């Protein structure tokens, strides 16, 4: 239930952030920040963690202060960078010695193996390499997000510190990539990789929808523990 609520808040944030950039509207930017804060603190608040009750009003005050100063849209430039880097880290950290790569854990969850040794060596190598590939793709996306945030005009990161953008793009163009097309790249990579994997390891899935059903069948507890 919490994951669903966070997803809805995330979708609301994406919509408001894009509209705020398109229309240069500080009120919508403030609304996007409020939804972002809610998405981050909702779980710890419901778990009654003391730090969340301290952080929430502080974050709300910072958002309002930025709005009052006319800079509510500035943090929105960095959110896609931080978000994508954080996801890349979820993949990359599992590549350390002694850890089970994230994609390997997902495949083990689907196939019911007790550990990496339960997978065929070829499949085990593939899942490790795929984990590294996801981390690499996401880091490249984060770099693109940061570059576009720097050169956006008006009020991009460079212009916010008094440096003229060498190759200006509009805020709407930045937002189109950072808040919308990012997800298209992720979805495209996901679909293309599945098509390749289905040929590389035939007989494991009846089709793409069957694969999605198996992912959903892992349940919220599996996904919560996977991302911790």
Each predicted region: which residue ranges?
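Alpha-helical transmembrane segments and their cytosolic membrane-interface
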Residues: 1-35
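Glycine/small-residue-rich interface belts in oligomeric ring/scaffold proteins
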Residues: 23-54
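Membrane-interface starts of transmembrane alpha-helices
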Residues: 5, 25-28, 75, 177, ...
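C-terminal membrane-adjacent module
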Residues: 115-228
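Lipid-exposed faces of alpha-helical membrane segments in multi-pass integral membrane proteins
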Residues: 5-8, 12, 34-38, 58-59, ...
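Membrane-proximal helix-loop-helix units in multi-pass membrane proteins
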Residues: 74-134
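Long, highly hydrophobic alpha-helical transmembrane signal-anchor segments
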Residues: 42-86, 157-171
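Structural signature of transmembrane alpha-helix termini at the membrane-water interface
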Residues: 15-22, 41-45, 66, 89-96, ...
């Amino acid at each position: 239930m919490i994951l669903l609520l966070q997803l809805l808040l995330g979708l609301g944030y994406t919509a408001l952030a894009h509209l705020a950039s398109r229309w240069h509207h500080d009120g919508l930017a403030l609304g996007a920040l409020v939804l972002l804060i809610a998405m981050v603190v909702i779980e710890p608040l419901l778990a009654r963690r003391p730090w969340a009750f301290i952080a929430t009003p502080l974050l709300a005050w910072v958002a309002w202060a930025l709005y009052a100063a006319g800079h509510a849209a500035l943090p929105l430039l960095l959110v896609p960078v931080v978000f994508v880097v954080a996801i890349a880290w979820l993949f990359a950290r599992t590549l350390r010695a002694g850890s089970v790569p994230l994609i390997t854990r997902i495949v083990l969850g689907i196939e019911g193996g007790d550990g990496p040794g339960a997978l065929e060596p070829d499949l085990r190598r593939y899942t490790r390499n795929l984990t590294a590939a996801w981390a690499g793709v996401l880091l490249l996306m984060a770099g693109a997000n940061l570059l576009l945030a720097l050169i956006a005009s008006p009020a991009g990161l460079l212009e916010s510190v008094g440096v003229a953008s060498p190759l200006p793009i509009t805020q709407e163009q930045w937002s189109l990539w950072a808040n919308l097309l990012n997800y298209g790249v992720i979805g495209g990579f996901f679909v293309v990789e599945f098509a390749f994997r289905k040929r590389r390891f035939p007989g494991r899935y009846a089709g793409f929808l069957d694969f999605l059903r198996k992912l959903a069948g892992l349940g919220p507890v599996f996904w919560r523990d996977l991302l911790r």
